[in-house]
Amino acid sequence: MKKIIALLLAVVMVFALVACASGSKTDAPATDTPATETPAADEAPAAETTGERLYIPVMAKGFQHQFWQAVAAGSAAAAEDYNVEIYFDGPASETEIDAQVNMVKNELAKNPKAMALAALSTDAVTEILEECAEKNIPVIGFDSGVPGDTTGAVKATACTNNENAAAIAADKFNENETVVEAMKNATSDNPVIIGCLSQDAVSASVTGRTTGFVDEMAKIAETYQPGKVSIEGHAKWEKKVDAPAIIIEVAISATTEATAVQTAANSLLGMNPVAIFCSNEGAVTGFLAAVSDGEDLAEGGKYAGLVVAGFDAGAAQKNAVRQGWFYGSVTQDPYQIGYKAVELAVKAANGEAVEDVDTGAQWYDASNIDDEMIALLVYD
């Protein structure tokens, strides 16, 4: 219990720091996959020092979602535990690739001992990674990391296994009576639609979740309607069949902006689906805008009976889950993503061998959202 209270206090303290200045320096800033327990301060080995603490910039994809504030909290806790100095920053939104590149360049000019990076575009930071490799500055990816890096600078990544995490939502749909009965009774004359709403088809984390959900949902659907499951909506996932009884419709918004996601959500809702999975907080935000902040999902509402699962957290999503408007959601452990990113960076800076870390995922719904361990993961 003491550790839980300590973690909660750390989260609250760093949220306050992030709110004041997004780029300020801080001295301390299917089956559910179990979240990794954060090591206590007395369990962390001391960082190698030569009179000054290690300096490690932690460059995020943005502050657009509260997810990143929880990541910042974890990175600050690790900085305190390992006695290192970090600088956590990111662009205002996840569309500002040039802004992130400039931030990373500025930090590289300070010759840090290591760097943690969640790149908006691997291509855009390739030259920076090459310089890191030349200077022997190890890079640790976090969240979606730096997919496809060919420079050798990226030594490991702290992230959720997104495919496994999203598959949890598909498995939960298979436990829902409404969805199961619809799949059992589906016909080619009256096919059942199950939707997947994603804000893009580029980000490694979002595409991984889309793939994980679609593949697992298709596998499940095949057990009810063999040979009659069609995946449609986007070329990256499309596997059409003739006369389908179940259609898994992949809806990708034109941009990551909330209004664009809302438009994609409205199109999906117009197909009269039995269930929809929203693959990140951005998808959830756009979807909720399309259903009157969730009220259209309530009893007597326009979309009452629609089974919806989300991903990540945020105040609006938590409210939808708590109200019973959402069937439930999958949460990553953003605190652990930040913590493990800094932990790996410290180890790499000290010459230790490092490897990828799966930071875990959990399902939460109205029945467990207030449980102590879930409450640590579902940020506002």
Give each language-model segment a name:
Residues I4-G23:
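Sec-dependent N-terminal signal peptides of Gram-positive bacterial secreted proteins and lipoproteins
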